[in-house]
């Protein structure tokens, strides 16, 4: 199970709103204690695609985030991105691009501006989705 603080959620939400009308993205790093994963830091990255339907994280920012995780004793827990105009569930492209069955994929839907929805998913090797 993944645990995220309210302040980290608000940081992600602000980043995703600032990215509108495009998708926004980032990484999450933290610690694992048994079955529990605790997000300790949210890394706000640039969507190189500047698109409202897909994203590509800036590779330099990704590398800097991973270096920071290592420096702080964190492990990569997964990534997040927004869906400006669709629900909080993996699209076919999201499933196709899911590279790690152990990574958490967080999707923040901004489809209803007054009611953002954040969900976490796992995507296995067969591209089957499990909601966390």
Predicted regions and their residues:
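Conserved beta-strand-loop surface patch within small alpha/beta domains used
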Residues: 1-76, 85-132
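Short, well-ordered beta-to-alpha junction loops that form the rim of enzyme active sites
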Residues: 82
């Amino acid at each position: 199970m993944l645990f995220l603080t309210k302040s980290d959620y608000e940081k992600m939400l602000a980043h995703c709103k600032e990215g509108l009308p495009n998708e926004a993205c980032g990484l999450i790093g933290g610690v694992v204690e048994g079955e529990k994963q605790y997000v300790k830091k949210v890394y706000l990255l640039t969507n190189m695609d500047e698109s409202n339907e897909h994203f590509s994280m800036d590779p330099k920012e990704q590398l800097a985030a991973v270096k920071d995780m290592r420096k702080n004793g964190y492990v990569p827990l997964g990534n997040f991105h927004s869906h400006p105009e669709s629900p909080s569930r993996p699209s076919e492209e999201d499933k196709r691009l899911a590279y790690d069955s152990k990574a958490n994929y967080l999707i923040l839907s901004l489809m209803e501006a007054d009611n953002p929805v954040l969900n976490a998913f796992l995507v296995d090797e067969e591209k089957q989705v499990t909601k966390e």
